[in-house]
Amino acid sequence: MKDFFKNVFATMLGVFLFGVAMTVFGFICIIGIAASTSATKKIEKNSVLVLKLDGSMSERDENNLMDELNGVTSLSFESTMKAIKKAKDNDKVAGIYLEVGQLGADLAQAEEIEKALLDFKKSGKWIIAYGESYSTLGYYLASAANKIYMNKEGMLDWAGLGGEKVYYKNLFAKFGVRYITTKVGKYKSAVEQMTADNISDADREQTQRYLNGWWNTILSTVARNRQINKDSLNAYADRVITLEAPENTLKYKMIDGLVYNDQVKNIVKKQLGIDEDEDINKVSVDDINGDETPVMGDHIAVYYAYGDIVDKTTPQGIFQSNHQIVGSEMCNDLEDLAKDDNVKAVVIRVNSGGGSAYASEQIWHQINELKKAKPVVVSMSGAAASGGYYLSSNANWIVAEPTTITGSIGIFGLFADLSELYTKKLGINYAEVKTNRNAVFGASGHSFTPEQLSMLQNHVNRGYMLFKKRVAEGRRMTVDQVEKVAQGRVWLGEDAIKLKLVDQLGGLDDAIEKAAKLAKLTDYDTASYPASSGIWEQLLNSYSNADDILDSRLQANLGEFYEPFKLVYSIKSMDKVQARMPYIIKIK
């Protein structure tokens, strides 16, 4: 018996020591990651900046520990733009090598990057693009290059733009679940996926409009950069040249050559004027951006506000990076910027399809307070719609790209009626005991009464009136003028400027330039806000690793169906009244 307990104790001790050893090993790995990410590589003469345009592009770098552990390089608009500008001004960088793949990004982001690439070429430097499989958006950016190459067995996705919306009403009905909506706005179609079985005429109209606008922008840019007729490009898309032999892509002059990976390296070496047996001095985005030196003096603050607008933080953990605009946090940040005497103007970079109407109102108010202290300019990225437009409307000046999705001035409420599921499908019975007739308003076992539905609709109506009032105040319009462009309709930036919803077409640089002008600055620096959370902060603040790993597995296995799944799942945690865009949009 004594030997038995010795063996048990020894086993337990061994397991404990193994756990300690693995924990220490994990922390050593994390220290190594932190050290490697902070190390700056020296840039040598005749170097090439390698831009990997593959995967999903975020607004800013997300410090995602799982990506770091897997050696995955994050792709962000902010870091990409900085790298191109620094490469242009660095005499040691001879050119840019675009390593293009299945890029997924907002077209508005791509518009700004394409302009930066063209500006890079104006300095006399060159750009070479290579891809094994080009997405439409990846090719759009590659068209800015001096030469475009594709693998001999590669593919170029060129078939136009389109997509499918999924409608869940009939699926939910099979389980006795019914979604009830209260909304204002003919075009406010965000609820249709839950309450309808097909697309409405109004939604089809607005969707067709922005798809046509996007496609025309892509066609015009590629036609200009590649000197190909737009009608020809449209004909190639109708024929779906994606599935044709790669040689046809060369014949259509969409690329300049079909080569293997090692062959394109020799092309780059020839461009650099070095022998084939010499190594290329490659510089990454992180290398050229280096460690940012904190801005100490007067500057313009660039505040990044992107993701769903929520009332409170949803735990994301160290393995996720679904960025959110948390109403209370953004209000605190803007209050701090108002008090900071070194901040002379604020540019808010918005990329959001909306979310909580309550949080949007709080941010609108805080921007109003911020304007009393210094100029506020909004730079709209891929989307600044519904709640995203709500908060943007109060800026002194609004800059949007022609392809930005904006407007969607409307509000809805979405409520799940689970009474049939519980009482008929599951056999659960409920008994009410109450002091007033609506005391169990929204209880799980009962449907909404006509009186309760009327109350909900009146609540949404009040929210819509406030939304229109806020837009009218911010844009110096009458409520009647706002109503004509509201009704939940989505607009492109190129339409929004005609409707006085935005002031200027352009990108982030244009917004910064306008902010400097409003603040009467001639010499200034910029600084990004809010401060990004580091790996250590993520470790200290996160205890949801299991959920994060599960989420990563779901994302990997569901693929394109992950976003609709996440939308349905997230409804349970949404504020009941939403100012939200109709859909999830990502161009590939």
Task: Report the location of each language-model feature.
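Flexible, low-complexity junctional segments that flank or bridge functional domains
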Residues: 3-48, 59-61, 94, 119-126, ...
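Charged, glycine-interspersed solvent-exposed loop segments at helix/strand-loop junctions
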Residues: 17, 169-267, 419-499, 503-504, ...
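Extracellular/periplasmic catalytic domains that process cell-envelope and extracellular macromolecules
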Residues: 42-45, 292-298, 424, 520, ...
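Cleft-lining beta-strand/loop regions that shape enzyme active-site pockets
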Residues: 47-165, 294-421
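Acidic/polar loop patches that form or flank catalytic/metal-binding clefts of enzymes
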Residues: 275-282, 400-401, 430-434, 480-481, ...
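Intrinsic disorder and flexible/low-complexity segments
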Residues: 297-300, 304-341, 459, 530-588
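Active-site proximal loops enriched in glycine and acidic residues that flank catalytic Cys/His/Asp
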Residues: 304-307, 350-352, 380-382, 395, ...
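Short glycine/threonine-rich loop-to-helix capping motif typified by GTGT followed
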Residues: 357-362, 495-498, 538-543
